[in-house]
Amino acid sequence: KRVLITDVSDFRLEIARKCGIIDTLNVAKTPLKEGAKRLFGDEDFQAAFEVAGVESSIRSLMECIEKGSTIVVVAVFGKDPSLDMFYLGEHELKVNGTMMYRHEDYLTAIDQVSSGAIRLEPLISNHFLFEQYDEAYKFIDENGATSMKIIIKL
């Protein structure tokens, strides 16, 4: 099984690679359909997670995913996307929404991080003491495009 992570930020894709993701694609430079075809060949892909929250993203997924597959919408959309419901039905696509995680999800994540299967260190951009919370938020404001997670130690 292969996983393709997409983004419009080369910085974020580099962080994904440091976390162990092998296949990444900057969809601002290469269309999803072209990148997915290169990776998956004629089989396309059978599952997708929409986490961007923009109409063009979910439309691209619908156009590229294999017939009868599932798209899980994790993102919170800023405005209601317009989707081609005829295409959705004709291609037997399933669109599932999700808002919260279940207790079992946390247990699985803890096991995967503890075993080393998932590397989180590359996601951490900086550390601050609790007393430095103003400085931490200033850092976030000034470095939003090149930072991921900021740790504030209690």
PLM feature segments, named:
Residues 47, 70-72:
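Conserved catalytic-site loops of classical short-chain dehydrogenases/reductases
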Residues 69-70, 94:
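Short glycine-centered segments of the SAM/dcSAM-binding site in methyltransferase folds
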